[in-house]
Amino acid sequence: MERPPGLRPGAGGPWEMRERLGTGGFGNVCLYQHRELDLKIAIKSCRLELSTKNRERWCHEIQIMKKLNHANVVKACDVPEELNFLINDVPLLAMEYCSGGDLRKLLNKPENCCGLKESQILSLLSDIGSGIRYLHENKIIHRDLKPENIVLQDVGGKIMHKIIDLGYAKDVDQGSLCTSFVGTLQYLAPELFENKPYTATVDYWSFGTMVFECIAGYRPFLHHLQPFTWHEKIKKKDPKCIFACEEMTGEVRFSSHLPQPNSLCSLIVEPMENWLQLMLNWDPQQRGGPVDLTLKQPRCFVLMDHILNLKIVHILNMTSAKIISFLLPPDESLHSLQSRIERETGINTGSQELLSEMGISLDPRKPASQCVLDGVRGCDSYMVYLFDKSKTVYEGPFASRSLSDCVNYIVQDSKIQLPIIQLRKVWAEAVHYVSGLKEDYSRLFQGQRAAMLSLLRYNTNLTKMKNTLISASQQLKAKLEFFHKSIQLDLERYSEQMTYGISSEKMLKAWKEMEEKAIHYAEVGVIGYLEDQIMSLHTEIMELQKSPYGRRQGDLMESLEQRAIDLYKQLKHRPSDHSYSDSTEMVKIIVHTVQSQDRVLKELFGHLSKLLGCKQKIIDLLPKVEMALSNIKEADSTVMFMQGKRQKEIWHLLKIACTQSSARSLVGSSLEGVTPQLPPTSAEREHPLSCVVTPQDGETLAQMIEENLNCLGHLSTIIHEANEKQGNNMMSLDWSWLTE
């Protein structure tokens, strides 16, 4: 494996050099990995004999790195003992290893030829802005900010940007002006390029140039020319000018606005242009803006914080396939946001359904800020999906995104010959257009997926209600069976004792009414028709889940995008001399991509309409299930009440029967002091209301029977008379409690 120059064979012990990460003016940065511990560090070593001045600068970088501690500045660490030796008479510099490569590598990807995504731009703005602010607070000017000196690291699934290579950094604690070293020319502030005195505002120019390139895909001022050339043409630009390009006539066109295409949403474009006007001011004294007296920091950092703190909700209108963005003021209610959506889309608030990516409906009780995730920025990172509940048929596809002027020019005449240098710009926009068509489909597919997840949530709720309904129906059925059997038995026993015991027409009528009600409630518990509808919906949903249109269908579009990227790569590798070429192959790809998007969107919206139709069936069915469940619960409650009421009546009858028994005992005790007892008849033994007096033991019972055998006939006569008298008294009792 390759060793960095000067590193002797066998040196490093358990540390093994894995790859060369980069090469600078006189230094190499290599990745070292511990063979046993799986630790990784970046080692910067000198590859040349250094002059005294450069050796001092090398050592100065190490001193600066060791005293810095910030999340967006790469950290220095101790050189492992096995590697701690001099190379070319200077020490090594050990740093944390960032595995994501540098920003230049990201910008060079063909898919980023027209700039990065909004989320990436805002992440870079936040990270590098924070790192620069930290360096300046510590009186350090970097002086060589460029994409090659910004590295990326994955931290818990989030990409962090870190500033590296402080070899040209200047510690200005001895004074505010420096006239020493000149860094990379393309990103260099004008005063450094002209070797004039400078301040920390040189980093503003470099930072602004980098951010502009991340937005547009190229540097702001005549990016195809060498700095010596474009400086002379740009130096007298208006302070608000942030972009300059050369027309076919050779005339330079200036603009205070960002060029198109780019990925920024409309709400961010203006504040970003204002920020770039501060950062790209040619005058170093005006660059960055005045210091805010309250916040005690330059205007550029105040505006940067404002941009990063904007709460913007991005909503994909699934009825039109268009994205609408809203700036959320503090504490705005969801209803207020929906009113703004109505004005923008014409969908009234009552018909709006806003779904998260997980298919969860937004909570109207919570503020509108629930549409924005903490720490997540950019319309490419998080979207809310708008549906019109009054519609179940979506008529897509809709018109494809519009072509830029350049792309439209070659589409109208694909055989027109253009210079290679101009064709690169046109084809870059063509790649951006093809990628945009694929992304438009991906967003709509994500909206369809949110609708599917919402449908499944409704289906889960319906299933729970179905299970509750079936359980309640089964319980009602069991209770009705018990009630029916028990009331039949009670009516039979009541009929048996009527001729010799207690009777009440009111009570008998009430019991028979209960029996009729129970028969009616049995019909309430019949839910088979609802079960059939629910099972039919379950089957329909399963078919929708299995449908190929429920899965991403953009394979052909991805293939076409890759073909466009490959064509663009080939063009970039061609020499930019005076040769010309046409755009026939690129235009074919554009046309095929539009046709492919049209086809997959027809399939997508057809499937989406089925999803929404199925969901509407569930919405229509849920009230019926709720009503059936409510009726069953009401019937259940009524049956239990009737059962309890009848049991109270039976106990009341038992109380009356006991009163009769007590009366018989009193009559018997008045007959010459003798209280003979007769064995109960079979009828009395079986009747639950018979008052049975039980002797204390068997011997006493036998004695009592023997003593009273002689009085049996006389006692029977007395009891018969007492029964007749008591029967007459029953008619005068208060039976009003039966109607309670």
Swiss-Prot record:
Coiled coil: none annotated. Its EC number is 2.7.11.10. It comes from the Eukaryota. Pfam families: IKBKB_SDD, IKKbetaNEMObind, Pkinase. The modification Phosphoserine is found at S176, S180. Serine kinase that plays an essential role in the NF-kappa-B signaling pathway which is activated by multiple stimuli such as inflammatory cytokines, bacterial or viral products, DNA damages or other cellular stresses. Acts as a part of the canonical IKK complex in the conventional pathway of NF-kappa-B activation and phosphorylates inhibitors of NF-kappa-B on serine residues. These modifications allow polyubiquitination of the inhibitors and subsequent degradation by the proteasome. This is Inhibitor of nuclear factor kappa-B kinase subunit alpha. The gene is CHUK.
